[in-house]
């Protein structure tokens, strides 16, 4: 039975987190290893809710870290499953129905304060000292204000044989202050009505035929974890729209992509998500990793976000140019020719900013 690694970043989602986590623990497919990454939440209950679910389900491990943005939280999951962290138990004795505390021993690039796991996962004190990362077959990301259909993992796993990536469709729920409601999903724009297996070149050709340059990938499906480790792909830190760079390199490196037109993911579009900043930001609630830019722009959230968006595009374009220098395969070249000019052109929009750091 294949083991699935689930990575869930958490940031100020006390209103939505239970619905998200309930959709995970009630999946019809149960062989899961679930990482919760609290990215410096400042609300009252996000961390407490995460601890509650970690306590009652031994499949969970919770990392509590300094705020660093969505990319850093997802990368904690990738690095943990890759065996890049050594955990040292802070808790010396097991108490029934309690959380065992761990600290990172050595390399700690994302300033992880503590890790927590349920006492149910350990039989004795020796288990504490021998605790290590699980070996997973596939990895999938879920944003903590969203949720899955209860058959999501099962539908993915049965289709992952001999493919590197599975891409599924999603549905959206909208908050009242979100504009552009009820837009078509990328799956609908690309007109994939039936499930199929495609090559990256075929994806690029479909993108050209429908006039779309959308190739983002974060929570959009499942990834073969050995493939992900082989290509050494992670999310770029301290940018927004990090799933564009991730998606382009993921697809350019893949051989086969499974297209599943089922809407298995429920995406909640709201203003103050982990990946979004808007005019409602104040000095009191601005996230830590965004604070320097916010203050540089005189606490003008709109200008600060415009800069972050432009700088993110430049960073993305430069990283993509560097990646494609050494790519010779037909699939990679098709992705490059279809998508790189678009994102390089967007990067040049930084020259239109009124104020540059």
For the regions a language model picked out, list residue spans one by one.
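Nucleotide-sugar donor-binding/catalytic module of glycosyltransferases
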Residues: 1-290
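C-terminal subregions of glycosyltransferases and related glycan-biosynthesis enzymes
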Residues: 268-357
């Amino acid at each position: 039975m294949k083991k699935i690694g689930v990575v869930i970043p958490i940031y100020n989602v006390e209103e939505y987190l239970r619905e998200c986590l309930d959709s995970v623990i009630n999946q019809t497919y149960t062989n899961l290893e679930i990482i919760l990454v609290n990215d410096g939440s400042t609300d009252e209950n996000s961390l407490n809710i995460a601890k509650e679910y970690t306590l009652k389900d031994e499949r969970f491990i919770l990392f509590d870290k300094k705020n660093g943005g969505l990319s850093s939280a997802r990368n904690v999951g990738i690095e943990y499953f890759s065996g890049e962290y050594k955990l040292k138990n802070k808790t010396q004795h097991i108490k029934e129905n309690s959380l065992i505390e761990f600290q990172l021993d050595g390399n700690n690039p994302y300033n992880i304060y503590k890790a927590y796991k349920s006492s149910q996962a350990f039989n004795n004190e020796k288990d504490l000292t021998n605790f290590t990362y699980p070996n997973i077959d596939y990895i999938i990301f879920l944003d903590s204000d969203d949720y899955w259909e209860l058959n999501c993992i099962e539908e993915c796993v049965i289709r992952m044989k001999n493919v590197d990536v599975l891409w599924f469709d999603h549905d959206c729920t909208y908050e009242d202050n979100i504009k552009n409601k009820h837009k078509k999903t990328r799956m609908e724009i690309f007109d994939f009505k039936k499930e199929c297996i495609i090559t990256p070149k075929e994806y690029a050709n479909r993108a050209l035929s429908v006039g779309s340059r959308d190739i983002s990938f974060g929570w959009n499906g499942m990834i073969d974890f050995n493939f992900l480790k082989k290509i050494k792909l992670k999310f770029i830190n301290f940018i927004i729209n990090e799933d564009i760079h991730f998606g382009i390199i993921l697809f350019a490196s893949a051989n086969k992509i499974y297209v599943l037109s089922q809407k298995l993911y429920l995406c909640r579009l709201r203003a103050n998500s982990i990946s979004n900043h808007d005019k409602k930001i104040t000095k009191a609630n601005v996230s830590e990793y965004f604070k320097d830019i916010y203050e540089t722009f005189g606490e003008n959230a709109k200008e600060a976000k415009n800069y972050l968006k432009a700088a993110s595009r430049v960073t993305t374009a430069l990283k993509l140019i560097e990646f494609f220098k050494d790519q010779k395969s037909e699939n990679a070249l098709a992705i490059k020719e279809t998508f790189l000019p678009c994102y390089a052109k967007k990067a040049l929009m930084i020259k239109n900013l009124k104020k540059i750091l």
